Regions:
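Alpha-helical scaffolding within the catalytic cores
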Residues: 67-70, 94, 119-122, 177-178, ...
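Histidine/lysine/aspartate-rich catalytic loop segments that bind and position anionic ligands
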Residues: 189, 193-201
Length: 276
């Protein structure tokens, strides 16, 4: 299978399943296509015991535990060897749960941290030694829509990570991508956009800002994750629409497309009217 075919097969497999929380999910079923050796799930989260890994007071959702051994069970069924664990917004700038998950997984794990201007350099150095290779800007969950604020946050993140060779990852939307397009295009570090760049399925490829994302991907100046497809949907009938977004991005540049399960699908719930 080509890279394009593998990406679409992975997405199609997700679209065939409803959304369930980690504690409601059945055992994973076996896949029906070949997975490349060394395959990587590029977007996952770990939620530890809240008594040991307390949540950020300003969080917008409260997830149930999702532990490294549960994720490993899924990855064995999917024949996935490597993983990227991303610090979710519910922990603020506390990356302890991510580091815990990376340590449990071992050398096949890498991490993406969340930091701010108060994060000391020695902490970044320590995370680098542990396998962190990027920082995430949670603009969407922080309610940041102002273009100037977004540009300032992006520039500050680039400055912090440049000497380490890390990347900057953004959880945002197409409007913000359009606002920072010039910065992303000239960035000295790799730029990654989460979850289809925050595009909405019902907006289609013509929605404002999506063309800017496509252009960044086509030019090789940014990566985009085909992850968290459920986030783009407001109804299950929109599944073909999110598939069209994926096809548009893959056609632009398959070498700048990343795939992730978004396990354990945080802030998700069964569709209204459907029982778990």
């Amino acid at each position: 299978m080509t890279r394009r075919e593998i990406l679409l097969a992975g997405l199609a497999g997700w679209l065939g399943h409803r959304r369930l929380r980690a504690d409601q999910a059945p055992q994973p079923s076996q896949i029906n296509f070949d997975v490349p050796s060394g395959a990587c799930d590029c977007h996952t989260h770990i939620f530890g015991d809240p008594r040991k890994f307390p949540f950020f007071a300003g969080r917008v959702y409260t997830p149930p535990p999702a532990l490294p051994e549960e994720m490993a069970t899924l990855h064995r069924a999917l024949h996935i060897q490597r993983v990227v664990i991303v610090t979710p917004s519910v922990y603020g700038t506390d990356n302890s749960a991510t580091l815990y998950g990376m340590k449990a997984r071992g050398r096949d794990a890498r991490g993406v941290a969340v930091i701010d201007e108060k994060t000391p350099e020695h902490e970044l150095d320590s995370m680098d030694r542990a396998g962190v290779r990027g920082v995430r800007l949670n603009l969407t969950t922080s309610g940041i829509a102002d273009p100037k604020t977004g540009r300032d946050r992006f520039a500050a993140a680039v400055e912090r990570v440049q000497r380490r060779g890390w990347h900057v990852q953004m959880n945002t939307n197409p409007a913000m991508i359009a606002a920072i397009k010039d910065l992303a295009a000239s960035s000295p570090v790799p730029v990654v956009f989460d979850h289809f760049g925050g595009a909405r399925a019902d907006g289609g490829p013509s929605q404002p800002g999506f063309a800017d994302l496509v252009e960044l991907v086509r030019s090789g100046r940014a990566y985009v994750k085909l992850s968290g497809a459920y986030r783009a949907l407001s109804a299950p009938s929109q599944a073909p629409d999110v598939l069209l977004l994926a096809q548009t991005l893959i056609a632009a540049n398959p070498d700048r497309i990343l795939w992730g399960t978004d396990w354990p699908h945080p802030d998700s719930a069964p569709w209204p009217g459907r029982k778990p």
